[in-house]
């Protein structure tokens, strides 16, 4: 049961008031899907689909982040990339849009993402993974979490 779970960021503490969490699902957890989940679990922690920090920087993934302000309830934004600066910038944008927390994707095994050093590809470079976590955590006040896997 996660009811009342406290998540601390550098300047913001968040409290989950529901035992329902909807994980980020590429191609599934869009705004419409989240609205359906929210109908049955109003206080659930929902997530966006994973957002490529570089695409967001170039203006291609803005909709996934900017639409947060139109929604109610806690929504986490899952980011992936291999560049600490891009991840920090994307995290700031997500926080400004109202993200409840930022989740760093270090678990996606999709080849085109992992071979560029994103997703589970970060497991192969622990120093880079640490730099990304540090840059994101220092860029935002909301809690930062990491989705990972046990091995590659």
Task: Please tell me what each predicted stretch does.
Residues 49, 78-79, 105-107, 149:
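Short beta-strand segments
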Residues 50-57, 106-126:
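Glycine-rich, proline-tolerant flexible connector loops at the mouths of alpha/beta enzymes
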Residues 98, 102, 112-113:
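Active-site gating/metal-coordination segments in enzymes
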Residues 14-20:
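Extreme N-terminal starter segment of soluble prokaryotic enzymes
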Residues 66-76, 119-146:
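Alpha-helix-loop-beta-strand connector modules within alpha/beta enzyme cores
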Residues 3-9, 25-100:
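Glycine-rich, positively charged N-terminal anion/phosphate-binding segment
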Residues 85-86, 143, 148-152:
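Active-site glycine- and acidic-residue-rich loops that bind
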């Amino acid at each position: 049961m996660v009811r009342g779970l406290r998540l601390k960021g550098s300047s913001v503490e968040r409290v989950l008031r529901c035992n329902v969490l909807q994980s980020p699902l590429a191609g599934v957890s869009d705004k419409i899907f989240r609205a359906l989940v929210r109908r049955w679990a109003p206080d659930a922690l929902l997530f966006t689909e994973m957002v490529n920090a570089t695409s967001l920087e170039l203006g291609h993934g803005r909709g996934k982040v900017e639409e947060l302000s139109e929604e109610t309830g806690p929504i986490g934004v899952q980011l992936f990339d291999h560049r600490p600066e891009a991840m920090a910038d994307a995290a700031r944008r997500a926080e400004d849009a109202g993200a409840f927390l930022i989740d760093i994707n270090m678990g996606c095994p999709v080849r085109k993402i992992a071979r560029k050093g994103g997703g589970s590809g970060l497991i192969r470079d622990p120093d880079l993974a640490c730099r990304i976590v540090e840059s994101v955590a220092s860029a935002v006040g909301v809690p930062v979490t990491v989705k990972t896997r046990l091995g590659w």
